[in-house]
Structures are given as C-alpha cells and as structure tokens.
Amino acid sequence: MANLKAIRDRIQSVKNTKKITEAMRLVAAARVRRAQEQVLATRPFADRLAQVLYGLQSRLRFEEANLPLLRKREVKSVGLLVISGDRGLCGGYNNNVIRRAENRAKEIKAEGLNYQFVLVGRKSTQYFQRRDQPIDATYSGLEQIPTAAEANQIADQLLSLFLSEEVDRIELIYTRFLSLVSSRPVVQTLLPLDPQGLEAADDEIFRLTTRGGKFEVEREKVASQVRPLAPDMIFEQDPVQILDSLLPLYLSNQLLRALQESAASELAARMTAMSNASENAGELINTLTLSYNKARQAAITQELLEVVGGAEALT
C-alpha cells in the first residue's frame, strides 16, 4: 500500500507541474501576440524615417557628408552588444546567443584587437561577469515587450562609446526570429553605419495563429511603403545637418527591431519548451497510471490469495 501511495502522490505532483507548464505556454503565446502587435505599430514610424533618409541619400552623397556615424577608421577595439534574456526555461535561447558572442570575442582577439561587451539581459551578464570579461555596461529587467525608451537608452551608450573612440566598430549579436521552433543567433555591424544599409528594403511580418489546435507562425513579406520625397521639397536646414540628427534615431530604430526579434525568439523558445514539458508530463502521467494500476491489481490479487489461503487453512 505504501508503494501505491507513493505512485499516487507522484501522479498528482506531475499533474500539478503540467498545469504550470501549460499556463506558462499560454502566457508566452499571449506575449508573442503582443510582440507581433508592437512590430506592426512601429512600422509607420520606421517607414517615414526610411523615407526621409532615402530622400536625403538621393540628394547628397553620404561619402561627402563626413559625418561621425558614417566615418570608418582603423579598427583597434570592437564593442560587442549582446542581447539575451533575463530568465531561463526557454530551451537553448540564452546558451546559443552567449556561445555565439563568446566565439566572436575569440575571433576578434585572434585578430589582435581589443573588445568590450555591452550586455542586455541577466543571463549574458552573469555569464561574462563570472569569466572576468571586459564589460562596459549592462542592462537587465527590461520590459517583456521592448520599448523605444529602452532602445534609446542602449543607443545612447553605444553612441558614447563610438564617438569617444573607445571602440572603432560596434557589432550586434542577437537572435533572429525564424519560427516557433527555429531561431538563429546572428552578428551584424551597427556602427559605423553603412550608407547602403540605409536604403529602403522590404520587411517581414510574423503572425501567431492556431491551426489544428496548435500554435503556428505565418511569415509575410511586406513591400516597403517608402516613397521618394517630392523633388521640389525645400529643407530649412542643411541636408547634412538633418542627416546628422536622424542617424542616431535610425540607430535606435534598428536596436528596437533587434530587441523585438530577440524577445519574440525568447518567447517562442519558451512556448516550445513548455509545450514539450507538458507533453512529457502527459506521457509520464500515463506511465505512472499504468504502473499504479498494475501495482493495485497485484495488491488485490495478493489479498485474494491470502483470503483464499486463510479459508483453506480453516477447513
């Protein structure tokens, strides 16, 4: 009977755990939808900003503007902006981006260059602090759905590093969102800005949907809505001054998109991890229930044999 009670308690414990993992999966799904809505909400601003930059690019040659954020110089030190999460229970999301950042740092060191980290997320901060890596700034406790204010704060720190010439190049390492079951850590150069990278480009929107009772992600290519500025438009200020003012805003917008992609990747990884945990819990419950029924049947059979044996002894 003691064995039966232990199995019964274990079944109840696993059922309680399954309720928790299922709730976490649904919460992550709701937040993925919120992230999706935020991406759509920020598109008009991004399109208008791209329109102005595109128009300025058509009126002057960026190479002749000689702006600090476009100026390439000899690279002696590299800043690495790494975006990770604050929490675990999201599969290999944090480990993958941290490993990519660590490998990139080794590559930079092998080239004879210095590097320092700007870390977003508690997981990457804890990892690199324990290994005494050079860290310029850390950010944690950000909103589950990234905000423009957070992107601006990080962008200000990066601009300070670059313009003070503490670093000569800044690279961004984040997780690109591909699907609910797939994401990929990527590395891209943030500063100095590439004039060719300011051109209007098509975008991609993701939507969380349900099909057959399961969550799925639909991706849609969206043509850029950017149109050239009117040829007779007159700028009150010098176009170079306008461009100099808009480039930091463009950088913040790029950071916001990277934060959004990383957040969506983390939430999708958590959804997948919790879904797998729920399925494993269900299988474990079935196995334990089968074991419980077998043990109970064996106990009943043993009691019957004892009763029959006792009755035969009395006759």
Swiss-Prot record:
Record-given protein name: ATP synthase gamma chain
Family to which the UniProt record says this protein belongs: Belongs to the ATPase gamma chain family.
Molecular function terms from GO: ATP binding; proton-transporting ATP synthase activity, rotational mechanism
UniProt key word Coiled coil: no
Major subcellular site: membrane
Keywords: ATP synthesis, CF(1), Hydrogen ion transport, Ion transport, Membrane, Thylakoid, Transport
Entries under NCBIfam families matching the protein: ATPsyn_F1gamma, PRK05621.1-2
Topological relation to the membrane, as annotated: Peripheral membrane protein
The organism's place on the tree of life at top rank: Bacteria
Pfam families associated with the record: ATP-synt
Organism encoding this protein: Nostoc punctiforme (strain ATCC 29133 / PCC 73102)
